[in-house]
């Protein structure tokens, strides 16, 4: 009976290493990385914007918890849990404005759509995926721009003046041409009838020509300037209102 062999040290060591390897591999089996856009996403005030997010390696995320929040106070922008959108957990300023696009959630890809973009939406967003106790996240940035950011007063005046100048030159040339033809025609008729012709008869005062050309020009220009100022005041008022009442 003394000849019964005990487990050798190498075999015990191999079993221990195999068990350790299985535990490590099982612990890493559920891990993944969350990937978001590397560059800032740009949107215009009042438009829609989409914030994409995915996990790598790709896997079915239907049973995971997926969401977006805004640092630093972790305001919930959108939350997906237990296969449903949890609208009750949203921050008040995002209720009714977000939609989670889940067409590719089986591949671990989702997109958050935000409607009616506001100035207050500018800044950082964080997307996260949670699988049981394991969670990973990725940060992204949204840039909100004024739809009329390129319209400076100088550009507006230039856009208004160029067509006006062309219109003024065209109207002036047409007016002079008609006046010349009319004077020539009347002169010929008067000479044929042997009547006295007064060269000042068809001469139009300069102030009348100026009034005839300038008045139609100033009207559209003034209207454009008023429209520009109204739009900027409206956008500025919306921005200040969002700052006063963020929720």
Curated annotation (Swiss-Prot):
The protein's name: Myelin-oligodendrocyte glycoprotein
Disulfide bond annotation, renumbered to this chain: 53-127
Cytoplasmic side: 176-210
The keyword Cell membrane belongs to this UniProt entry's keyword annotation: yes
Keyword field contains Membrane: yes
Tissues in which the protein is found: Found exclusively in the CNS, where it is localized on the surface of myelin and oligodendrocyte cytoplasmic membranes.
Assigned GO CC terms: external side of plasma membrane; plasma membrane
Organism of origin: Homo sapiens (Human)
Recorded disease: Narcolepsy 7: Neurological disabling sleep disorder, characterized by excessive daytime sleepiness, sleep fragmentation, symptoms of abnormal rapid-eye-movement (REM) sleep, cataplexy, hypnagogic hallucinations, and sleep paralysis. Cataplexy is a sudden loss of muscle tone triggered by emotions, which is the most valuable clinical feature used to diagnose narcolepsy. Human narcolepsy is primarily a sporadically occurring disorder but familial clustering has been observed.
Domain of life the protein comes from: Eukaryota
GO molecular function annotation: signaling receptor binding; virus receptor activity
Signal peptide (from-to): 1-29
Keywords attached to this entry: Cell adhesion, Cell membrane, Disease variant, Disulfide bond, Glycoprotein, Host cell receptor for virus entry, Host-virus interaction, Immunoglobulin domain, Membrane, Receptor, Signal, Transmembrane, Transmembrane helix
Glycosylated residues in this chain: 60
A biological process term (GO) from this entry: T cell receptor signaling pathway
């Amino acid at each position: 009976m003394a000849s019964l062999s005990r487990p050798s040290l190498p075999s015990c060591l191999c079993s221990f290493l195999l068990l350790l390897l299985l535990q490590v591999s099982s612990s890493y089996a559920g891990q993944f990385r969350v990937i978001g856009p590397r560059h800032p996403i740009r949107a215009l005030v009042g438009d829609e914007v989409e914030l994409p997010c995915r996990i790598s390696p790709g896997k079915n995320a239907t049973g995971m918890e997926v969401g977006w929040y805004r640092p630093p106070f972790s305001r919930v922008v959108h939350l997906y849990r237990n296969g449903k959108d949890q609208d009750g957990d949203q921050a008040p300023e995002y209720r009714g404005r977000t939609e989670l696009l889940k067409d590719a959630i089986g591949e671990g890809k989702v997109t958050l759509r935000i409607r009616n973009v506001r100035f207050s939406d500018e800044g950082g967003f964080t997307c996260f995926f949670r699988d049981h106790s394991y969670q990973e996240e990725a940060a992204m940035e949204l840039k909100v721009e004024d739809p009329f950011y390129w319209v400076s007063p100088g550009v507006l005046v230039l856009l208004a003046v160029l067509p006006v100048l062309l219109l003024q030159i065209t109207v002036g040339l047409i007016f002079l041409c008609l006046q010349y033809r009319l004077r020539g025609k009347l002169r010929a008729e008067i000479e044929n009838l042997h009547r006295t012709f007064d060269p000042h008869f068809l001469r139009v005062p300069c102030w009348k020509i100026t009034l005839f050309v300038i008045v139609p020009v100033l009207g559209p220009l003034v209207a454009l300037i008023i429209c520009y100022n109204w739009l900027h005041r409206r956008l500025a008022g919306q921005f200040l209102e969002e700052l006063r009442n963020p929720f």
